[in-house]
Each structure stands twice: as C-alpha cells, then as structure tokens.
Amino acid sequence: MSSSSSSSASSAAAAAFRPAVVQREQQVVEEKFPAAAAAMREMVLPPVAAAAADSEQEQLCYVHCHYCDTVLVVSVPSSSLFETVTVRCGHCSSLLTVNMRGLLLPTTAAAAPPPPPPPPPPPPPPAAHFPHSLNLAPANPPHHHSLLDEISTANSPTQLLLEQHGLGGLMASAASCRNNNSPAAAAAPPPPTSQGKAAAKEPSPRTNTAVINRPPEKRQRVPSAYNRFIKDEIQRIKAGNPDISHREAFSAAAKNWAHFPHIHFGLMPDHQGLKKTSLLPQDHQRKDGLLKEGLYAAAAAAAAAANMGVAPY
C-alpha cells in the first residue's frame, strides 16, 4: 500500500514537469500495459533511492572563513568526516583547510549528556565524646623526660644515696651534657661574659707553643781577624794609590796575609830574617814604605782581635 502511494506520488511529481503530449502517451501506456508501466517505474526508482542514500551519507557542516568573516555551509561526505579537507570560500575564493575531526567532535560532545557528578565524600566519623571523669589525656601533654632528668631533678632517697657515695656529680654532669645537646641549647648562642672577653684577648696556647718552637734568631757574627785585616789593608792600599783597582788591592792584601803568617798570632814583625817582597810591581819607589805600613797595620789588627777574645788560627 505504501509502495503504490509513493510510486504514484513520484509519477505525479515527474508528470508536473513533462509536456502534455508525453503525459498523454504515458497515460495510454499505463492503461493498456499496466505491467510494463510498473516495470518502467521500478527502473526509474533506484537512481532516486541512490540519490537519497547519497544525501543521507553526506553531512552539513558550518565552516567559518577567517578572510572575509563568512560562515559557509559545507556538505562533507561521510568518508571524509574524520579527515582534513580543503574548502573554497564562495565569497572570497580563499582556500581553507578544515580538520573535520576537530569540527565534529565538539558538536558530538555537546550533544552527549554531561557525566554524572562524582559522589560527595563521606562525612568524617564523629569524635567520641567521653565524660570528664574518663578523659585521661591532658590538654597540654608535658614533654617527655628521660630517666636521667627524673633522677637528677627529683629529691628522692636514691638521689641522696648517690650523693653520699660520690655519684651525684656524675648524674649532674650527664644531665648537663644532655641539656647542651638539645636543639634549643644548640640554637641559642652562649651569652658573652667578661671571662670570655679576657680569654679572647689573651693568645691561645697553640700560639704560645708556636712561638716557643720557633728557631732562635741568628745572631750577627763578629767578623774574623782575616776579614778585618783584608778590609783595613784594602783601604790602606787604596789610600796610598787611588788609581789601583779593587781586585788588585784585594790580591795585594791577600798576599800580605799569606806571606806573613806570624801576624796571625798578634806578634810584631821581625825585620832581621824577613825576605822583602815587592807587593806592587808598578810602584817600585814606595815598596819599602808600603811593606812596613802593611806589617804594622796587620800586627795592630791581630792584637786588637786577640784583645777581643778571638781565637787565633
């Protein structure tokens, strides 16, 4: 019944747009050959059904063009609903890349019913109320004391016995050590005292030890008789001959010390058995005077050294 009504409606709709001659011929064919007319209608219906199926497989989507600020109505095939498609704007001819998955999922999420709210948390169990007679816990519990504190602070017969046997000081020292190791005692700095200031001013024992262990300072040594003789002899030779070099004067002074060993003992020179040697080859005129002056100066230096307590060589 429904198929005949739909076929008649479709034929009537098609006949409204056909010429009058074609409509008449179709009516004659339907009257004479009803079976052939029904077959022809069945052959025409499938394309219409296919078009309806295609229209059902497509979905209308709304795309916003960011170039011209226009909302576009786009028909997207069902095979491309979860892909990225390219849409051309009919207003500004711009190409838009649209992700259909992101475009359709918000509508699906909006259409879905909201999830039920989570159940509220269970209320906490009521606190047990005890009468005051059974409430054994104090409001402010005292700090836990060790056994040493109780023994040291309590005035008990045990404390008296310990003091009698000489162990009271041991317990007191243990209690003081425990108090010093507590966090409060470690955090609080010790109060400054006058004794502490005096101790800070005084040098530490370690510093005193370092001063004691320091090696003794070297005393300035007294120049030897040889050094004094050479120094005086060089000055005497340079005074007599200013043009002489220091090396030549030192060589002459060393020869005087080597050639006259008796002057080392502070003795006066003996001119009887002494061989005269020329000290300065370039000065032949004053060699006797230089020799005598050198001998007497060396003897005087040796005598002075002997008087000062210098041991002879």
From Swiss-Prot:
SUPFAM superfamilies (UniProt xref): HMG-box (SSF47095)
Location(s), subcellular: Nucleus
Assigned GO CC terms: nucleus
Zinc fingers typed C4-type, residue spans: 65-92
One Pfam family from the record: YABBY
Major subcellular location class: nucleus
Compositional bias segments (type: Pro residues): 112-128
Protein name, UniProt field: Protein YABBY 3
Species assigned in the record: Oryza sativa subsp. japonica (Rice)
Gene, per the UniProt record: YAB3
